[in-house]
């Protein structure tokens, strides 16, 4: 459906766009301006509203105009009245009466109306001729359209007859309901054409656009003059008010000056007997300045708008500017300059803005400060100006600027001067992770739940510790899981009676000691395993001492009760001597007799562990952010830094920002002891994580932070402190410990791990290796045990950079594979002295080699040859020995060595040779030396390595 714009409709019906827009709004149409579009039906409605009303009103008026022609001026007035009566119901701008004082305007309007009346008659005749031509063209076009529509209708009837009756009925009903009949449309079109023709004829006879334009212009001029008069009255009123205010201010100042003069005179009279009375009486009147009334004379102030305004007419078109002084040329560049603004303006009547008074703020009663606050920060806190504080500090003897930091004492003195109580703010060190392990006030007491105990098995070598761990791992870990453990991460969990127990697979008590040294008391219960046939051994006593230092309960597992020589009672009595007393004897330590090899009483041992854990009341809060300890850490080629963590409090989630030791990162992936991916790790759960930027140390604490930014800041701060501490702990060499330091730095060690078939062989081999004496090197037995070489031995050897020595034993397939992967050397022997020789050779290999100089021969230069782009060639004769191609040479001149280097080339005549023998001649070139002279001596030598004994 085509649309029409409102200004097109207004042009067709001879109305203004504003009237058409208002009429469309009155009909409820959504239009905004003359450019809005409406449909054809809405356009017809708008046209009909304008055409229906004037039919009865305009005809007699048109006839009256035709029958009795009136004078031109009266005809124009009557047409204006007709237009007013027609637009009573419409919304138009009200006409304003012209001011009577402006006679020249009435004359100008009359002349304009007369001219419009003359033009009207001429335009009316031409308009009628154009309309007749247009109507004739439309009638011709309408006949063509009717013939075409008639043929189209016949074709459509033929198509409709070919379709089914149901479609015809539906089509007929739709046509009947929505669209009028074709004949009705044609008749309506003819009626609309006739109506529009009549309207145009009426409009042509009724509307005079130029007369209306003249009337509208007159109304606009009248409106402009009223606005100008109002503006002038307001300006005049503003000037009167300003003058009145100035006069009042002048009178008030004059009155105040007079009162001050009277007071001065009165004071002078009361003090006339004093010696200074005369001076006072003469000085007081001088304070009153005479008022210059000439400067206060009221002068007419003209604004910029007054320059172009006239009292008897509208605004002039700047004709007064085109004078001799306002020529636009190079000599006068200010021809279009606007009046000045600001304090230099001559006619500035705008009163200055009053200065806003600063609000008074009371001082706070307390002030919480931090060390290093600046003056500006303090000023903002106490609502004072920084300059005021700087002044106070200056009076206190402290020279400071606004951005200078102040110490705590200065801030306290400043607050005392202001009368404010100063308190230092207690700052929490975000980089301190240890506070979470020392203070548990951050935990929620009402959300504490029971957690699984963390157990460490300790004991002497060959007492069954490894066997017990293997038994627990194979029989209890992942019951019902296919494949069992798929990844060994140094810690694992077992389940007994519906409760979990976490075991730490640490390589002996050494790792436990290193953890304790870092303050990581991760163990809740210690299982001390003692062999029933051996009893208490030295390492057993050491394990007892470590457990007591960690303040953890001890459960004694007496192993190997299946052996014939087992004597559990002797073990109980020996342990009682070291402070481990059984509950049967009135002590607090539980004793369990087991056989790890045959899986005997293992259930009873686990029940005892759960009983002790229940007595200890191990609790944890899973709602807080996770903290814990690093069990193991390694650098994987594909994953990067991998750390095995034990969660002690809170719950660890994937994507948590974490700080571990002196490093930080985000938990990218997390796997449990079965090697499966998990997203959540509750308390007492061992997990392996990735996503750290560096590899942490075993035993380091970790904590989860609220966001990655805080974690990064804490990690970087901890790394900075660790580096500073390392530099501070650097021992400086003094004269007292100079030689001790040199000796300690020179001594090197060879780390070995000994595994043998029997205990006697282990002790004998360890004693023999410790007796080997090589200057500057010593043997360090990292670990010695009985049995085959297993995975734990390979792991320990990799961590300590040790060599595994197997005496009459072989490594397991898993250990051999791990040794190849970790590049750990395994030496297998069956004769003890071969072991000693091999270790001795390794110890000698640790020493730095010693070299001795050996003179090969001497020669003398007989002639020199300088070759461009090559250098100086020396012809020589061998005096003694020989000169070889790979030997070092010294150039000696007058018994002084002037150069020491290597040969670049050696020739015998024209052939390159490897050596030149005694009494032979040859030629040579020396690398980076071209200053050979005749009679220079050449000494050839080599450095030989001395065998260390």
Swiss-Prot record:
Domain tr-type G, chain residue ranges per copy: 450-619
Gene3D superfamilies: 1.10.10.2480, P-loop containing nucleotide triphosphate hydrolases (3.40.50.300), Translation factors (2.40.30.10), Translation initiation factor IF- 2, domain 3 (3.40.50.10050)
CDD domains with a match to the protein in the record: IF2_eIF5B, IF2_mtIF2_II, mtIF2_IVc
Transmembrane stretches, start-end: none
Biased composition (Basic and acidic residues): 52-84, 104-143, 224-275
Region feature (G5): 595-597
InterPro entries from the UniProt entry: EF-G-like_DII, IF2_II, IF2_N, P-loop_NTPase, Small_GTP-bd, T_Tr_GTP-bd_dom, TF_IF2_bacterial-like, TIF_IF2
GO MF: GTP binding; GTPase activity; translation initiation factor activity
Region: Disordered, residue numbers: 50-206, 220-359
G1 as annotated region, ranges: 459-466
Compartmental location: Cytoplasm
Renumbered residue ranges of the record's region G2: 484-488
Bias (Low complexity) ranges: 187-206, 319-336
Keyword set includes Protein biosynthesis: yes
Pfam families: EF-G_D2, GTP_EFTU, IF-2, IF2_N
UniProt region (G3), positions on chain: 505-508
Binding site for GTP: 459-466, 505-509, 559-562
Region (G4): 559-562
Polar residues: bias regions: 144-154, 164-180
GO CC terms: cytosol
Keywords: Cytoplasm, GTP-binding, Initiation factor, Nucleotide-binding, Protein biosynthesis
Function according to Swiss-Prot or TrEMBL: One of the essential components for the initiation of protein synthesis. Protects formylmethionyl-tRNA from spontaneous hydrolysis and promotes its binding to the 30S ribosomal subunits. Also involved in the hydrolysis of GTP during the formation of the 70S ribosomal complex.
Family: Belongs to the TRAFAC class translation factor GTPase superfamily. Classic translation factor GTPase family. IF-2 subfamily.
Name of protein: Translation initiation factor IF-2
Organism of provenance: Streptococcus uberis (strain ATCC BAA-854 / 0140J)
């Amino acid at each position: 459906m085509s649309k029409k714009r409102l200004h097109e409709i207004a042009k067709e019906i001879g109305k203004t766009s504003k009237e058409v827009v208002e009429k469309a709004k009155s009909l409820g149409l959504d239009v905004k301006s003359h450019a809005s579009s409406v449909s054809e039906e809405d356009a017809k409605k708008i046209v009909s509203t304008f055409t229906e009303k004037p039919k009865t009103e305009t005809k007699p008026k048109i006839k009256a105009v035709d029958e009795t022609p009136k004078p031109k001026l009266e005809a124009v007035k009557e047409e204006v009245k007709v237009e007013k009566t027609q637009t009573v119901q419409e919304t138009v701008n009200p006409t304003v009466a012209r001011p009577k004082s402006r006679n020249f305007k009435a004359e100008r309007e009359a002349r304009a109306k007369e001219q419009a009346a003359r033009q009207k008659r001429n335009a009316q005749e031409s308009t009628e001729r154009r309309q007749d031509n247009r109507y004739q063209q439309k009638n011709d076009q309408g006949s063509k359209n009717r013939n075409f529509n008639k043929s189209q209708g016949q074709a459509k009837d033929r198509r409709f007859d070919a379709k089914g009756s149901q479609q015809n009925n539906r089509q007929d009903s739709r046509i009947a309901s929505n669209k009028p009949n074709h004949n009705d449309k044609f008749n309506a079109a003819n009626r609309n054409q006739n109506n529009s023709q009549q309207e145009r004829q009426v409009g042509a006879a009724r509307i005079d656009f130029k007369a209306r334009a003249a009337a509208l212009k007159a109304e606009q001029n009248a409106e402009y003059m009223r606005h100008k008069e109002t503006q002038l009255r307001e300006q005049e009123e503003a000037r009167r008010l300003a003058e009145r205010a100035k006069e009042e201010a002048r009178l008030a100042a004059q009155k105040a000056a007079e009162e001050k003069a009277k007071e001065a005179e009165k004071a002078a009279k009361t003090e006339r007997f004093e010696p200074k009375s005369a001076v006072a009486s003469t000085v007081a009147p001088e304070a009153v300045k005479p008022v210059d009334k000439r400067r206060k004379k009221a002068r007419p102030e003209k604004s910029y708008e007054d320059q172009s305004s006239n009292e008897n007419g509208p605004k002039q078109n700047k004709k007064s500017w085109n004078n001799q002084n306002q020529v636009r040329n190079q000599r006068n560049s200010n021809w279009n300059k606007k009046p000045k603004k600001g304090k230099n303006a001559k006619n500035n009547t705008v009163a200055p803005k009053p200065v806003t008074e600063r609000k008074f703020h009371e001082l706070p009663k307390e002030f919480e400060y931090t060390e290093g606050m600046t003056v500006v920060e303090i000023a903002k806190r106490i609502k004072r100006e920084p300059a005021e504080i700087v002044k106070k500090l200056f009076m206190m003897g402290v020279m400071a600027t606004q951005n200078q930091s102040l110490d705590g004492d200065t801030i306290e003195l400043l607050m005392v001067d202001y009368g404010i109580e100063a308190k230092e703010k207690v700052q929490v060190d975000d980089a301190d992770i240890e506070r979470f392990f020392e203070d548990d006030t951050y935990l929620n007491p009402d959300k504490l739940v029971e957690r699984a105990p963390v157990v460490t098995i300790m004991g002497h070598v060959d007492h069954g510790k490894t066997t017990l761990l293997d038994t627990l791992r194979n029989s209890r870990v992942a019951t019902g899981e296919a494949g069992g453990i798929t990844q060994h991460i140094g810690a694992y969990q077992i389940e007994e009676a519906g409760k979990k127990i976490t075991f730490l697979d640490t390589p002996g008590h050494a790792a436990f000691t290193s953890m304790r040294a870092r303050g990581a008391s991760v163990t809740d219960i210690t299982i001390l395993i003692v062999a029933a046939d051996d009893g208490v051994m030295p390492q057993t006593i050491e394990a007892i001492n470590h457990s007591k230092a960690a303040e953890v309960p001890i459960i004694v597992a007496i192993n190997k009760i299946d052996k014939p020589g087992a004597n559990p009672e002797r073990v109980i009595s020996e342990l009682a001597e070291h402070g481990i007393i059984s509950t049967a004897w009135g002590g607090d330590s539980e004793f369990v007799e087991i056989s790890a090899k045959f899986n005997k009483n293992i259930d009873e041992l686990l029940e005892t562990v759960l009983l002790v854990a229940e007595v200890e009341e191990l609790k944890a809060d899973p709602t807080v952010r996770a903290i814990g300890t690093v069990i193991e850490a390694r650098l994987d080629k594909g994953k990067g830094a991998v750390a095995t963590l034990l969660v002690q409090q809170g719950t660890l989630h994937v994507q948590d920002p974490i700080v571990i030791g002196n490093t930080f990162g985000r938990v990218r992936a997390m796997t449990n002891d079965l090697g499966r991916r998990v997203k959540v790790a509750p308390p007492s759960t061992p997990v392996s994580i990735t996503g750290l930027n560096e590899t942490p140390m075993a035993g380091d604490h970790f904590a989860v932070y609220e966001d990655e930014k805080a974690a990064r800041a804490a990690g970087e701060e901890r790394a900075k402190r660790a580096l500073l501490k390392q530099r501070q702990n650097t021992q400086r060499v003094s004269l007292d410990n100079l030689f001790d330091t040199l000796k300690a730095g020179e001594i090197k060690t060879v780390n070995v791990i000994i595994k043998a078939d029997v205990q006697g062989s282990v002790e004998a081999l360890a004693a023999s290796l410790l007796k080997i004496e090589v200057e500057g090197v010593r043997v360090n037995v990292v670990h010695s045990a009985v049995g085959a070489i297993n995975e734990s031995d390979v792991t320990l050897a990799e961590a300590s950079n040790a060599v595994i020595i197997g005496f009459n034993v072989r490594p397991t397939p898993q250990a051999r594979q791990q040794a190849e992967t970790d590049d750990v050397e395994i030496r297998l022997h069956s004769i003890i002295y071969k072991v000693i020789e091999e270790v001795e050779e390794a110890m000698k290999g640790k020493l730095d080699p010693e070299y001795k100089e050996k003179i090969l021969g001497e020669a003398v230069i007989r002639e020199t040859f300088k070759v461009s782009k090559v250098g100086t060639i020396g012809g020589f004769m061998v005096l003694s020995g020989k000169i070889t191609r790979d030997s070092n040479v010294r150039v000696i001149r007058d018994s002084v060595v002037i150069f020491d280097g290597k040969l670049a080339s050696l020739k015998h005549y024209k052939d390159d040779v490897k050596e030149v023998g005694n009494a032979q001649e040859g030629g040579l070139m020396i690398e980076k030396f071209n200053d050979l002279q005749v009679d220079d001596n050449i000494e050839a030598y080599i450095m030989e390595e001395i065998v260390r004994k």
